[in-house]
Amino acid sequence: MAELRPSGAPGPTAPPAPGPTAPPAFASLFPPGLHAIYGECRRLYPDQPNPLQVTAIVKYWLGGPDPLDYVSMYRNVGSPSANIPEHWHYISFGLSDLYGDNRVHEFTGTDGPSGFGFELTFRLKRETGESAPPTWPAELMQGLARYVFQSENTFCSGDHVSWHSPLDNSESRIQHMLLTEDPQMQPVQTPFGVVTFLQIVGVCTEELHSAQQWNGQGILELLRTVPIAGGPWLITDMRRGETIFEIDPHLQERVDKGIETDGSNLSGVSAKCAWDDLSRPPEDDEDSRSICIGTQPRRLSGKDTEQIRETLRRGLEINSKPVLPPINPQRQNGLAHDRAPSRKDSLESDSSTAIIPHELIRTRQLESVHLKFNQESGALIPLCLRGRLLHGRHFTYKSITGDMAITFVSTGVEGAFATEEHPYAAHGPWLQILLTEEFVEKMLEDLEDLTSPEEFKLPKEYSWPEKKLKVSILPDVVFDSPLH
């Protein structure tokens, strides 16, 4: 729960911001990390010393539910001559270390990141006649902050967030987010490390899909060229009713060319998925490592979890902590990170140590496998094949309903335990599937209807008997079984 008050209002939950000429004695009573970020805000908004602020009534470090202590809201006049409209500018306080006493973040020194190393910002177009900023963006930022604290995954510029609901709970088409550097806020050196500022940018579903298929930075650049869709400062307009591709159809050609040239930076997603070993009789479950719908999933060993974390760090941090909390209780939202690929794609860890399977969990070669996805996850298979495998990369689905993962690898990926001789291999509940370029092209032809969800009827099955591979697209309810 939060309350709205001027940031300079007295009280234990919202300490007053110091003036530009505050004496050192007063500044010393102010949390140093908070003081440093306020200094950057004062540089940008010298005429707004006490902006409205949404404040967590019970602080996170006192057991409250909201990780952000404060969200300040400023009025930005923009620049009409540069196609930058007047807007509200929201700035968070709490993802970085505000206090330096380990109450929230462990102090690790002044040279590295402060806390998680960043704060969130958001720019919302001001509506005509609007005298005060809406407060819903503060709750949106709290939701993203909860994800960061729960998962310990950080955000980077170019990342995207699949939210699956209008950001303001209206009927808006703006239902997802990209992240980018704030165009005005400069990195701040605090006594507890460096803080950068990442801006949330609201986007339509079609724009999110393009970011997944290509990369977030490319779509952000396109949004900057369309004033109504964001313009130079990427200001979110919740009343925008058209995608950038409807506004300028030529932009789709730039995306298609980018995918063909660059491939996709997205290397993994949290998903509703499962796999079965069809080469093993159903009753023969001794030493079985596959996760079957309707059966109790086996859990990853600690070593397996660490291996998957390390080897897929470039694009997917796999863990057993909650995924992004839903803005709408009826929906479960997922987060997908969009990272730039390294020079050589590999399933090795950062230390260049190849995967060495734990001796107690042997790697098994499988003769035949059955992959199962919900419709949203299945719709990403063409992206996996065209944007990743055809560019010599890998792509991972990490289950959000069990401790298992499915990694597709191309023949050029190093460190994989699936090989051309044994293309299906499992290490515990982690399945790897190696696909040749020829087979990828064949699958893309056969899976073409996955790109037209409006014409899709579930369940849907695809089969390649000569490859002993089957893929099923199933209703969400199949994956929501309490036993799965």
From Swiss-Prot:
Give UniProt keywords alphabetically: Acetylation, Ciliopathy, Cytoplasm, Developmental protein, Disease variant, Isopeptide bond, Joubert syndrome, Nucleus, Phosphoprotein, Tumor suppressor, Ubl conjugation
* Sites bearing Phosphoserine, chain numbering: 301, 342, 346, 352, 481
Give the GO terms filed under biological process for this record: aorta development; coronary vasculature development; heart looping; negative regulation of osteoblast differentiation; negative regulation of protein import into nucleus; negative regulation of smoothened signaling pathway; negative regulation of transcription by RNA polymerase II; negative regulation of ubiquitin-dependent protein catabolic process
Tell me what happens on changing residue 257 to R: Abolishes ubiquitination by the SCF(FBXL17) complex
The covalent link annotated as Glycyl lysine isopeptide (Lys-Gly) (interchain with G-Cter in SUMO2) occurs at 321
Its annotated compartments are: Cytoplasm; Nucleus
Reported impact of residue 181 to A: No effect on down-regulation of GLI1 activity
InterPro entries found in the cross-reference section? SUFU-like_domain (IPR020941), SUFU_C (IPR024314), SUFU_C_sf (IPR038489), SUFU_N (IPR037181), Suppressor_of_fused (IPR007768), Suppressor_of_fused_euk (IPR016591)
| Effect of mutating residue 406 to T | In JBTS32; decreased stability; forms cytoplasmic aggregates; decreased interaction with GLI3; no effect on interaction with GLI1; decreased repression of the hedgehog/smoothened signaling pathway
Q: Which GO terms describe its molecular function?
A: beta-catenin binding; protein kinase binding; transcription corepressor activity
Reported impact of residue 221 to A: No effect on down-regulation of GLI1 activity
Its PTM note reads: Polyubiquitinated at Lys-257 by the SCF(FBXL17) complex, leading to its subsequent degradation and allowing the release of GLI1 for proper hedgehog/smoothened signal transduction. Ubiquitination is impaired by phosphorylation at Ser-342, Ser-346, Ser-352 and Thr-353.
Mutagenesis or variant effect for residue 262 to A: No effect on down-regulation of GLI1 activity
Q: Does the keyword DNA damage apply?
A: no
UniProt region (Disordered), positions on chain: 1-24, 279-360
Covalent cross-link (Glycyl lysine isopeptide (Lys-Gly) (interchain with G-Cter in ubiquitin)), residues: 257
Using the record's annotations, give every residue carrying the modification Phosphothreonine. 353
Where is the sequence biased in composition, kind Pro residues?
Answer: 12-23
**Residue spans of biased composition, Basic and acidic residues class:** 336-347
Where are the N6-acetyllysine residues found in this chain? 303
Which residue spans traverse the membrane? Answer: none
Outcome recorded upon mutating residue 159 to A: Abolishes down-regulation of GLI1 activity. Has only slight effect on GLI1 binding
Q: How does it assemble?
A: May form homodimers. Part of a DNA-bound corepressor complex containing SAP18, GLI1 and SIN3. Part of a complex containing CTNNB1. Binds BTRC, GLI2, GLI3, SAP18 and STK36. Binds both free and DNA-bound GLI1. Interacts with KIF7. Interacts with GLI3FL and this interaction regulates the formation of either repressor or activator forms of GLI3. Its association with GLI3FL is regulated by Hh signaling and dissociation of the SUFU-GLI3 interaction requires the presence of the ciliary motor KIF3A. Interacts with ULK3; inactivating the protein kinase activity of ULK3. Interacts with RAB23.
Q: Which disease is it linked to?
A: Medulloblastoma: Malignant, invasive embryonal tumor of the cerebellum with a preferential manifestation in children.
User: What protein name does the entry list?
Assistant: Suppressor of fused homolog
